[in-house]
Amino acid sequence: MPGGKRGLVAPQNTFLENIVRRSSESSFLLGNAQIVDWPVVYSNDGFCKLSGYHRADVMQKSSTCSFMYGELTDKKTIEKVRQTFDNYESNCFEVLLYKKNRTPVWFYMQIAPIRNEHEKVVLFLCTFKDITLFKQPIEDDSTKGWTKFARLTRALTNSRSVLQQLTPMNKTEVVHKHSRLAEVLQLGSDILPQYKQEAPKTPPHIILHYCAFKTTWDWVILILTFYTAIMVPYNVSFKTKQNNIAWLVLDSVVDVIFLVDIVLNFHTTFVGPGGEVISDPKLIRMNYLKTWFVIDLLSCLPYDIINAFENVDEGISSLFSSLKVVRLLRLGRVARKLDHYLEYGAAVLVLLVCVFGLVAHWLACIWYSIGDYEVIDEVTNTIQIDSWLYQLALSIGTPYRYNTSAGIWEGGPSKDSLYVSSLYFTMTSLTTIGFGNIAPTTDVEKMFSVAMMMVGSLLYATIFGNVTTIFQQMYANTNRYHEMLNNVRDFLKLYQVPKGLSERVMDYIVSTWSMSKGIDTEKVLSICPKDMRADICVHLNRKVFNEHPAFRLASDGCLRALAVEFQTIHCAPGDLIYHAGESVDALCFVVSGSLEVIQDDEVVAILGKGDVFGDIFWKETTLAHACANVRALTYCDLHIIKREALLKVLDFYTAFANSFSRNLTLTCNLRKRIIFRKISDVKKEEEERLRQKNEVTLSIPVDHPVRKLFQKFKQQKELRNQGSTQGDPERNQLQVESRSLQNGASITGTSVVTVSQITPIQTSLAYVKTSESLKQNNRDAMELKPNGGADQKCLKVNSPIRMKNGNGKGWLRLKNNMGAHEEKKEDWNNVTKAESMGLLSEDPKSSDSENSVTKNPLRKTDSCDSGITKSDLRLDKAGEARSPLEHSPIQADAKHPFYPIPEQALQTTLQEVKHELKEDIQLLSCRMTALEKQVAEILKILSEKSVPQASSPKSQMPLQVPPQIPCQDIFSVSRPESPESDKDEIHF
């Protein structure tokens, strides 16, 4: 089977095992070189004993051993240590550190960077040696006499390697043998093991037992073994003296090949009892000397050389010829390689046929020897006519003749004919056919024939009759193994599993089978009774119970209850035991192998033999989410116990629960996330800070023309967006209230602005004259009409306007009122409930000039001094809304105060405005002509992209808008009529 043939040959990260093996007498720890403060990810037992700290206490502490600093620790040495870590260098220091019990100890500290396959420093290896005896004064009272001598002797004995390291290199003194780890650290980082996955390496001049060359060589040895098994019995039986030079050379070459095979066996790896590949030359030689060396050596002695000489005594020649049978021991090579050849069905069939033929050949040689011994009676020198050889000689026409001169019998069948006839008889007997042309006649021949028939029937029935049964019974596990492998291969091929994952699956199956030998542990345990099953489980988990102090106070019943709940898991390199985010539902004990804990793509811990990871279920009430990935670096054996099973046992054995909770220390708690900062991130932050510090900031002043231009574009965009959303007729009417002060008194007035809006405006806006009495300076209404459409919308704005005393008269006062309105335009809480006095009126001039404009059915507002409106169609009935509050954009549930406005105050204000307006218009008439063309061009450009805002205070000033521009919205300012209205009309 491949598992037994190849062994465990998957790439493994054996860094931890190599360091532990090389530093068996040293104390060391490993720190992550990619995380700030270089936290400790592993510490061996030697360091824990030397420092007094438990491994769980040291984990995640700084590799600089800052937790062991004290008052007497040299500050300069501390700085040098940090510089060594910062620069990823190798260095050594003498530093004074403090144990856990605060005992000061001098250490010889060595630091070496560990690189991965990309030549990136990922770990730091720090080794420690206690040199306190060399640093303390020797001539004090406590060190005199025999005490001083004993201390020096112990120091020189236990710290020989440290003394050599402390000795200057330029002194020509006798240098003792260094420790292996010290040699590694002194020779440089090239010899240090790398933290990476790699295939098992073989030393020089060592051949892998599963390589192509060794496989071919084994098949050659198999063929030569069968050659030896055939020729040795033939030469012994037929007493052939090797006079033929060709056969002698061939046999000599075969002997040389077997001698070479012995030499190769001293340099060939083998599979250990645990499935591992043994490549140590010393172990290989010892294993071969204890097993097959003696047998192989006896089978390779050159026995044919004795027979090659002419003058050799017949007895000696016969003896050495008989010793050739020892070469049949070479068949042991076939036996020990049989599991290699049984891997293929065709090879099994060929081997079985060859075995049958080989047995027939041996029996044929024996059959001829019996006939040759009985055919001539050496005592009487007569021939036995009842021998099968004599009968054969007569049947084939080559009878025996007696040579009287020599006194011997000559003639008879040739040796070839004799061998073929002997083989023919044995084959017919073994296959139970028996034609009878060659039959035994003497008693010895008959007895041999009976034995041969028994052997033949057994061979025939075994090999040819029960081949399927033999395979099923003898190779049941092998067949099941191959069946499982075939099923897995078909599954991987069917679902197109990636190649890398497929190799991991196959390697896991092979390694698991190699460890369990195909035995179903659960099935075997289910056969055993409860008591026996518990005893077996305690034996299987004995390593966990003996190594961890948490189980020392457990009773036999408690251990048996725990052992039954434990499960054994075998992990291949690269397998993930826990994924980040998974529920941690088991407590894991590492029995063999090494694992790494990866958080945020960084190694935060390396777990080895004796470590425990998982969660403290006995202290937490909820399941934890794994904060990191736990991945196997090598082939690992884990003993795990589920959360529910553990809590069940702890609840029953309360006394053990307290001891277990107190003594069990998790090497890695997957519930707690480790907070760290990567060195690369710190460097990036520093570079970003320096970049921002050196970056030149550009700022544009507030009054810069470019900033003003962009602000203007932004305001125009907002106006367009607001104009496009005015679709609710109830929101298009706002009533504005204003208060004015005249001669120190508060005068209240109401200005009604009516906005009629139809479809979206397509042309530029302009003001047009709407009143018949425009020549008189009593302007009743000024309208901004749109370009068609009958769907008009009215907008009323109510806003309080405070008229301050001393702000002017007439037009000046109106301008002041408008300025006050702009200052108070955000105060929407002063909206009144006064009825509107402004009514829409028809404009015959505008209807004549613009055919597309629909005539307004509303008449001009009729008013009198008493403020009574005579119009039969009021503005509050023109739209759908019936209440002025419904025209306001403020929420309906808000309460608004009302301020009644007398019509007399409004009339007085408008009269003053009329006179003031008359004077101002005369002054502006000359300027309007020049500005008319410019304004028209500006409005023409902006008309396609902008929509005027009806509620804007600027839109209420009629002096800045040129007349006779069609398709405009209507702004009408209603006031009471006066007798002088016709005189107050002014042409724009």
UniProtKB/Swiss-Prot annotation:
CDD domains in UniProt: CAP_ED, PAS
Region described as Disordered: spans on this chain: 717-742, 838-890, 969-988
Q: Which GO terms describe its biological process?
A: potassium ion transmembrane transport; potassium ion transport; regulation of G2/M transition of mitotic cell cycle; regulation of membrane potential
Q: State the superkingdom.
A: Eukaryota
Under InterPro entries, the record lists: cNMP-bd_dom, cNMP-bd_dom_sf, Ion_trans_dom, K_chnl_volt-dep_EAG, K_chnl_volt-dep_EAG/ELK/ERG, KCNH_animal-type, PAC, PAS
Q: Which cysteines are joined by disulfide bonds?
A: none
Instruction: List the ranges annotated as motif Selectivity filter.
Output: 432-437
The record places the cross-link (Glycyl lysine isopeptide (Lys-Gly) (interchain with G-Cter in ubiquitin)) at K785
Q: Where is the PAC domain?
A: 91-143
Q: Which UniProt keywords apply?
A: Calmodulin-binding, Disease variant, Epilepsy, Glycoprotein, Intellectual disability, Ion channel, Ion transport, Isopeptide bond, Membrane, Phosphoprotein, Potassium, Potassium channel, Potassium transport, Transmembrane, Transmembrane helix, Transport, Ubl conjugation, Voltage-gated channel
Q: Which residue intervals are annotated as intramembrane in the UniProt record?
A: 420-440
Q: In which broad location class does this protein mainly occur, judging by the first location in its UniProt entry?
A: membrane
Give the protein family: Belongs to the potassium channel family. H (Eag) (TC 1.A.1.20) subfamily. Kv10.2/KCNH5 sub-subfamily.
| Record protein name field | Voltage-gated delayed rectifier potassium channel KCNH5
Q: Which gene encodes it?
A: KCNH5
